[in-house]
A protein has these predicted regions:
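Charge-dense, helix-prone N-terminal extensions
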Residues: 1-118
Length: 118
């Protein structure tokens, strides 16, 4: 099971990532863009998606792992249940959310250090 500390460690390992409170809960930003926040619901954290359509596909494919509340209905983001993902999947999810918010120079530096393994 992934813990809040695991999520924090992965988020802060990404270039330019900073932790700031959001409604008294941890959130993580790159520049001024929020890419992850620990949610007030138990066993949930919020991440961004590329689009509402992409998010909806994830929700349909794996409703046990991913969900939204009415607040996120028209927003390109979703909630993840950390108890339902392993460390590798959580790392991939958090990194992808960061990639959607990071400036090009940080993406280039990150990609140079982490070339694709496919």
């Amino acid at each position: 099971m992934v813990t809040e500390e695991d999520v924090r460690r992965v988020a802060l390992s990404l270039p330019g990532s900073v932790e700031r409170p959001y409604n008294r809960l941890p959130s993580f930003r790159v520049r001024s863009s929020l890419f992850l926040r620990i949610h007030e619901l138990p066993d949930a954290f919020f991440v961004r998606s590329a689009s509402v359509e992409e998010r909806n596909e994830l929700l349909r494919a794996e409703p046990g792992k991913f969900f939204i509340t009415p607040h996120y209905e028209g927003y390109p983001g979703y909630l993840v249940r950390p108890s339902q993902v392993d460390l590798d999947e959580m790392t991939e999810i958090v990194t992808e959310s960061w990639r959607l918010c990071a400036p090009k120079r940080l993406l280039a530096a990150y990609d140079a250090e982490h070339p694709p393994t496919w």
